[in-house]
């Protein structure tokens, strides 16, 4: 994936 995904904690 080219989009930066932020880890959801």
From Swiss-Prot:
Modified residues (Valine amide): 9
Keyword annotations: Amidation, Neuropeptide, Pyrrolidone carboxylic acid, Secreted
Subcellular location: Secreted
Lineage top rank: taxon: Eukaryota
Record's signal peptide: none
Tagged with keyword DNA-binding: no
Residues recorded with modification Pyrrolidone carboxylic acid: 1
Matching Pfam families: Periviscerokin
An example Gene Ontology biological process: neuropeptide signaling pathway
GO CC, one annotated term: extracellular region
Role, per record: Mediates visceral muscle contractile activity (myotropic activity).
Membership in a protein family: Belongs to the periviscerokinin family.
Name of this chain's protein: Periviscerokinin-1
Classification lineage: Eukaryota, Metazoa, Ecdysozoa, Arthropoda, Hexapoda
């Amino acid at each position: 994936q080219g989009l930066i995904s932020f880890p959801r904690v």
